[in-house]
């Protein structure tokens, strides 16, 4: 078997090859008329891939399924148990074939946040050290709102002819999660996002989109650097 040159290329620390970065988004959910149904997946994959390029960590691709609360019916999702099982299987496969020991999961879909409660068990069943990065979720704002629109502009996946229709909330109830009354009652953050979209509308700002991406990418790179320290 050939001896691998772990120091080859633009690599600051050869131990980074033991670290993987994987996106966790959602491929099948509505985001209003201006955004594709796999917006979350593409945003998460971009962040994970760019962080991989900058740090040298292994890019592991993206998890296929996603979870969502029952009271938010805006796409096709799986149960939390099924998502957990898929993540375990995916990470075990990466560990087997790529010899990784640590992973940063880049979450770009708010519905996946409950998976954080299962991280201890996922680590136990994969024997991996895992960091769950939620930076983009905490900064992008409402579902289908200005943050996602602006990042979509950066990626070139926005339908600009439909931006004016993005806030037709009677037709596109998923924008800001406006039409999901039970979810709004249960979560003050969802209620705040829905009101923001209703009262202030949405806008597209490519500079803002780049700033959001930079914040998220830098956060993931920082997590990778933390994993290098132990």
Swiss-Prot record:
It catalyses: 2-amino-5-formylamino-6-(5-phospho-D-ribosylamino)pyrimidin-4(3H)-one + H2O = 2,5-diamino-6-(1-D-ribosylamino)pyrimidin-4(3H)-one 5'-phosphate + formate + H(+). Its EC number is 3.5.1.102. It comes from the Archaea. One of its GO terms (biological process) is F420-0 metabolic process. InterPro entries: Creatininase-like_sf, Creatininase/forma_Hydrolase, FAPy_deformylase. One of its GO terms (molecular function) is ferrous iron binding. Fe cation 1 binds at residues 29, 40, 109. Pathway: Cofactor biosynthesis; coenzyme F420 biosynthesis; Cofactor biosynthesis; riboflavin biosynthesis. Requires one Fe(2+) ion for activity. Requires an additional second metal ion that could be Fe(2+) or Zn(2+). Keywords: Hydrolase, Iron, Metal-binding, Zinc. Its cofactor is Fe(2+); Zn(2+). Fe cation 2 binds at residues 31, 40. PANTHER family: 2-AMINO-5-FORMYLAMINO-6-RIBOSYLAMINOPYRIMIDIN-4(3H)-ONE 5'-MONOPHOSPHATE DEFORMYLASE, 3-DEHYDRO-SCYLLO-INOSOSE HYDROLASE. NCBIfam families: ArfB_arch_rifla. Catalyzes the hydrolysis of the formamide of 2-amino-5-formylamino-6-ribosylamino-4(3H)-pyrimidinone 5'-monophosphate (FAPy) to form 2,5-diamino-6-ribosylamino-4(3H)-pyrimidinone 5'-phosphate (APy). Homodimer. Belongs to the creatininase superfamily. FAPy deformylase family. This is 2-amino-5-formylamino-6-ribosylaminopyrimidin-4(3H)-one 5'-monophosphate deformylase. It comes from Methanobrevibacter smithii (strain ATCC 35061 / DSM 861 / OCM 144 / PS).
